[in-house]
Amino acid sequence: MKRIKAIYPGSFDPPTNGHLDLIERGSKIFDELVVAILRNPEKDPLFSLADRRKMLEAMTAGFDNVSVDTFDGLTVDYALRVEAHAIVRGIRAISDYEYELQMALMNRKLQPDVETVFMLPAEQYSYLSSRLVREIAQLGGSINGLVPELVEQKLREKMDVAHKFANSEPPEGTTPSEGRKKSRKKKA
């Protein structure tokens, strides 16, 4: 009997309980599920690729048929490289559907043997996105229940560092914004 392997691609910056919900349900549908973290040089992520991978590996440690990997390039090409038969995509709203439908049709054109499987999140996660979680955390709001505890802890650590940096005194002889720009360049 043919084993069905799927990938669940995304930036996962940060991983949320909505992602975990789809991973859990996807692991019941597919024989093997690869959570594939996209390395996108066009984006400036909050968490490094290594941090996101560690968080997702911790979140999925209880699933025997789930692994975590990173990739760059076209998702369908990655699917072929790892011999996956399907791409799992979460759909929260009509706006997600319109975008994901276009991507699925293009992926089918590029690689007809790779199917896209749309999954709806559990109702309590239908509004949840990594972007919203980041915004709430940056503004000091509660993200309890939106992300696993490990992710909440990592987000709080990031926000504490960012808050301390934002409130630090600039180097002598510079304006506050110039001082921050120079500090950022030194870290890069």
Please place each PLM-identified region on the residue numbering:
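Nucleotidyltransferase catalytic core that binds NTPs
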Residues: 1-188
